[in-house]
Amino acid sequence: MSNQQALREPPQTATQSADASSDAGSLPLLNLASGREAVLEYFENTWALTEQLFSSLASDEAYYVRPYHKTRHPLVFYYAHPVCFYVNKMLVSGLIDKPVNQEFELLFETGVDEMNWDDLHEGGQDVWPALDQVRQYRDAVYELVRQVIRTHPSLEKPITMASPAWSLAMGFEHERIHLETSSVLIRELPLEYVKEPDVWPDWLTAPAAQNYEPVEGAHYPTNELLEVAPTRVSLGKPHGWPTFGWDNEYGQDQREVNSFQASKFLISNGEYFRFVKAGGYEQRRYWSESGWGWRQFRNVKWPTFWVQDGPAGSHRYKLRTTFSEIPMQWSWPAVVNY
């Protein structure tokens, strides 16, 4: 099976193994004027990416483990939620006329308020169905969406906002948004619940040796501020543009932007390490009001995915990636907003 075939013909449940020789990869944003076959290919690619991501869960139990911060549902919700979204949006648009599983389409419809970092969800953890039931539901919706794409008259011409098939495009992009949601939740799980997917690319090229004292210019790039000249920027997406867009992307606006400075590189782990080691997390002046509230609430002193690898105060860290724990990669961009 070729790499493209592996993405076009995904395993329908995470219990079915994908081709170990294939690499996970995303197709470009779908051109909605490109016809049924392109729409089907994009859907199957989207589905495959979700299956590949969830194949990293090492056991059924991992689907039901609550995140340590308790501000999100367990991963079983995010495995079913995008699927439920397809059904509900197709019902609203008229692509289908009856639910697949009305109980699931209520249970998995709504997530949590991602803006409330202190909104703990303490109850209701016994409401989630068995994983086999969720997999059967996913299988049924997968076949339904394929059938709609192959047969519905609205896909005989380019998909626009006025087309019932716009709901399909919305479903594709909604599912892709949740790849980030789920990947972060997987990254937050204890390692015992996670494994690297067989189809994951061999991307790690950094030295295996641990280095606790990074040197600027050797272990991470020397950064500098670059001058950006004043300019006029145009914002907004034309309504006739042949790709899906969310409502806030449309309209037209122009703004005059004054000159400013921007760093040449993203802030690396090595550069951020200096901030951490200097006690930046304990200094109120560096934080917004809500950011400081979060820092105090969590009592954090370094980024979430930096793993302490020594006694308190030693500033010895490893790096937690999505599926494993590795030596700190000082040249990689710092991830600090979780």
Feature names for model-found ranges:
Residues 2-13, 61-116, 155-212, 254-255, ...:
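Short, contiguous alpha-helical
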Residues 110-156, 166-170:
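Acidic/histidine-rich alpha-helical segments that form the ligand environment
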Residues 130-142, 246-279, 309-338:
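Short aromatic-cysteine micro-motif
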Residues 179, 201-234:
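Contiguous, non-catalytic segments that form substrate-binding/exosite surfaces or channel walls
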